[in-house]
Each structure stands twice: as structure tokens, then as C-alpha cells.
Amino acid sequence: MAKVEQVLSLEPQHELKFRGPFTDVVTTNLKLGNPTDRNVCFKVKTTAPRRYCVRPNSGIIDAGASINVSVMLQPFDYDPNEKSKHKFMVQSMFAPADTSDMEAAWKEAKPEDLMDSKLRCVFELPAENDKPHDVEINKIISTTASKTETPVVSKALSSALDDTEVKKVMEECKRLQSEVQRLREENKQLKEEDGLRMRKPVLSNSPAPAPATPGKEEGLSTRLLALVVLFFIVGVIIGKIAL
């Protein structure tokens, strides 16, 4: 007896294509349409039930309606040299009057009432040009971030360590500048006093005015020289820190 032709329409009709990589679950959809004026029962079977999850794997499609079936391939180690021998079969029959117990209805169905369509599984790896660049982009960003972040952190740490020393040196410089300014004013005042003494009329009965105390002037000169040397040392320290 001739086999009854499948009344359901299948999209795709002959192949279920699964596109890798296969390190995660890969899902493809199978659309079942019922162009008839009667409700149709269906079930989806596979030769490798442990490798696939099918949702829904059975049901009833109303007249003129359609349903999408998700076929999920579980992760596995893909071998391009190994051809897939997995197959799916969509089996169908017109729904009986009583659909309360579909398991019994399938068991009681006559072979001539059953219709089926077979599809083979095809595994595909994405082409080089079609591969997503997210992984590469993330890798580049990560590498760039690592390269730029390390010097910044090191520089910040170095700056934090140097800031204390620089601050101390700057405070010392300010103190020395104030001291130099004070000495300059004191030296200027002494010179003015010395000039005033020189301009005063010399009285015959009065002893000649004594010039500015040499010891004091020598002390000022010595202190100025010491400050100059100290400034030089501070400059060298700042130069080393800056480097």
C-alpha cells in the first residue's frame, strides 16, 4: 500500500543546519505548517536523542496554523573530518476525535494513517570572514588596557612617593628664600647706616666714626655663601627627583 504523503509543510524541508562553534548549545528552528482544514498531530524523533533537545517534541497543530520547533544541539568536540549521520523524522497524523490521551492515540494509529518526513543534520563552521570579532576586540582592548594601565599606576605610585620629598624640599627652599631676603635687607640697612656715618661732619674733638663692624659683615658674607651652597644642593636634589 502506498505511503500517505505528508500534509505538513516543513521549513527547512530536507536539512537541519547547525552553525558552529559547537562549544555551546547551538539552536536551529524547524517550522511546521498545517495547510489543511483538519487538526494534525505531530511528533519529532531523532537518531541521536542524547545529543539534542527538541521543544516542543510533540503536539497538535490547528487547521491553517503553524508552529516553530526549536532543535538544540548540545556542546561537543567537533571533528570536521567526521560527517554527521544524525537524522530527524517528523511524524504526523490527523488528530482523532478524542485527543485527551495522545500517547494511546499514537499507539493505536494504523501504519497507513501515519505520515513522515526525514531531515538530515548538517554541521557548519562559520567562514573566517564571518567570525565575530568580539573576542579579538576584547583581547586587543584588554592588552591595550594592561599596557597603559601599568605605567600609569607605577607613575602614580612613584609620584605619591616623591611628593613627600618634594614637599619637604620646597618648604626648605621657601624658608631659605625668606632667610636670604632677610639677610639682604639687613645688609642693605648696614650699608645705609655706613653711608650716613661717612656723610656726617667730622668734629676735631670727636673721634672718627668707626666703620661698620668687619666681623658682622664677614658673618653676613659667610651666611650668604652658605645659603648659596645650600641652594645648589637643593637644586641637585630636585633635579634627581624630577628624573
Swiss-Prot record:
Checking SUPFAM superfamilies in the record gives: PapD-like (SSF49354)
* Main subcellular localisation: endoplasmic reticulum
User: Would the keyword Transmembrane be found if you checked this record's keyword annotation?
Assistant: yes
Where is the protein situated, by its record's location annotation? Answer: Endoplasmic reticulum membrane
Q: How does it sit in the membrane?
A: Single-pass type IV membrane protein
Q: Which part of the chain is the MSP domain?
A: 7-124
The protein's matches in InterPro entries, at most eight in alphabetical order, are given as:
Ig-like_fold, MSP_dom, PapD-like_sf, VAP
Query: Is Ligase there in the keyword field?
Result: no
For this protein, the record's PROSITE patterns field holds: MSP
Which portions of the chain have biased composition (kind: Basic and acidic residues)?
185-197
Bilayer-crossing regions: 219-239
Q: Which residues carry this modification: N-acetylalanine?
A: A2
Q: Where is this cross-link: Glycyl lysine isopeptide (Lys-Gly) (interchain with G-Cter in SUMO1)?
A: K147
The alphabetized UniProt keywords are: Acetylation, Coiled coil, Endoplasmic reticulum, Isopeptide bond, Membrane, Phosphoprotein, Transmembrane, Transmembrane helix, Ubl conjugation, Unfolded protein response
Q: What's one GO MF term for it?
A: protein heterodimerization activity
Q: Which residues carry this modification: Phosphothreonine?
A: T150
Q: Where is this site: Involved in binding the phosphorylated serine of the phospho-FFAT motif?
A: K43
* Sequence similarity: Belongs to the VAMP-associated protein (VAP) (TC 9.B.17) family.
**Binding partners and assembly:** Homodimer, and heterodimer with VAPA. Interacts with VAMP1 and VAMP2. Interacts (via MSP domain) with ZFYVE27. Interacts with RMDN3. Interacts with KIF5A in a ZFYVE27-dependent manner. Interacts (via MSP domain) with STARD3 (via phospho-FFAT motif). Interacts with STARD3NL (via FFAT motif). Interacts with CERT1. Interacts with PLEKHA3 and SACM1L to form a ternary complex. Interacts with VPS13A (via FFAT motif).
Q: What is known of its domains?
A: The MSP domain binds the FFAT motif of many proteins.
Protein purpose: Endoplasmic reticulum (ER)-anchored protein that mediates the formation of contact sites between the ER and endosomes via interaction with FFAT motif-containing proteins such as STARD3 or WDR44. Interacts with STARD3 in a FFAT motif phosphorylation dependent manner. Via interaction with WDR44 participates in neosynthesized protein export. Participates in the endoplasmic reticulum unfolded protein response (UPR) by inducing ERN1/IRE1 activity. Involved in cellular calcium homeostasis regulation.
Task: Indicate what this protein is called per its UniProt record.
Answer: Vesicle-associated membrane protein-associated protein B
State the organism named in the record.
Sus scrofa (Pig)
Biological classification of the source = Eukaryota, Metazoa, Chordata, Craniata, Vertebrata
